[in-house]
Design a protein with these regions (language model features):
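Alpha-helix-centered segments that form part of catalytic cores
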Residues: 35, 39-55, 160, 164-167
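Short, functional N-terminal and low-complexity linear motifs
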Residues: 27-33, 58-65, 77, 128-131, ...
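The substrate-binding groove and active-site-proximal loops of carbohydrate-active enzymes
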Residues: 44-60, 76-86, 146-153
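Short N-terminal helix-initiation segments at or just after the protein's N-terminus
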Residues: 18-25, 51-55, 124-129
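An active-site-proximal structural segment forming one wall of the substrate-binding cleft
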Residues: 3-4, 9-11, 54-79
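Conserved alpha/beta catalytic core and glycan-binding cleft of carbohydrate-active enzymes
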Residues: 6-14, 67-68, 72, 96-167
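Acidic/aromatic-lined carbohydrate-recognition and catalytic surfaces
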Residues: 1-44, 80, 85-119, 137-140
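A generic structural signal for ordered alpha-helices
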Residues: 28, 35-39, 49, 70-73, ...
């Protein structure tokens, strides 16, 4: 929970869940068709989804003095985006622009469980590794190939798995 959503009421009566006039209300999708009355990640009510295309939310995250700006100026080296492949490419590009605005040396890493170089999601080819999005991804296919080899799987299998992600 957070002061922005405030489902549990830990932050008084404000927040999008408790106050229909909250400035954060438009960040979320409230509808009785959803479990709990709002859209949440994979139906987990403790993980309300935000609308990454909402202009005020985008500004809150990427704008001057926003989340990205604040943490990087306080010394963070960069950010890791959880389930980056479920974020819109435009939003990732805006996050990257905010990161690089602070310093070109700051880093944006994405969690993508599959081969990110060939990733299709929601009916389209993902573009986050084409220069305007992520600096890198967590390479789980490579990690799995190496671990399988170390655990005794045939070297040829590891080689084929690694070559499948080398394009």
């Amino acid at each position: 929970d957070s002061r922005y959503f405030n489902r549990e009421g830990r932050y008084g009566e404000g927040g999008a869940y408790r106050d229909p006039s909250s400035p954060y209300r438009s960040w979320y999708d409230f509808d009785p068709k959803y479990k709990g009355g709002y859209r949440s990640w994979w139906g987990f009510e403790t993980l309300p989804e935000v609308n990454e295309e909402n202009p005020s939310y985008v500004e809150f995250i990427t704008g001057e003095g926003g989340v990205i700006d604040t943490w990087l100026r306080r010394g963070a080296a960069g950010f890791r985006l959880d389930v980056a492949d479920e974020l819109p490419d435009d939003f990732i590009e805006k996050i990257r622009a905010a990161v690089k605005r602070v310093s070109p040396e700051k880093f944006l890493l994405g969690e993508v469980w599959e081969d990110a170089t060939t990733k299709f999601g929601y009916g389209q080819r993902r573009t986050y590794l084409r220069g305007k999005g992520l600096d890198s991804v967590m390479n789980y296919p490579f990690k799995n190939a190496v671990l399988n080899f170390v655990k005794g799987k045939p070297a040829e299998q590891a080689m084929n798995e690694i070559l499948s992600i080398c394009e």
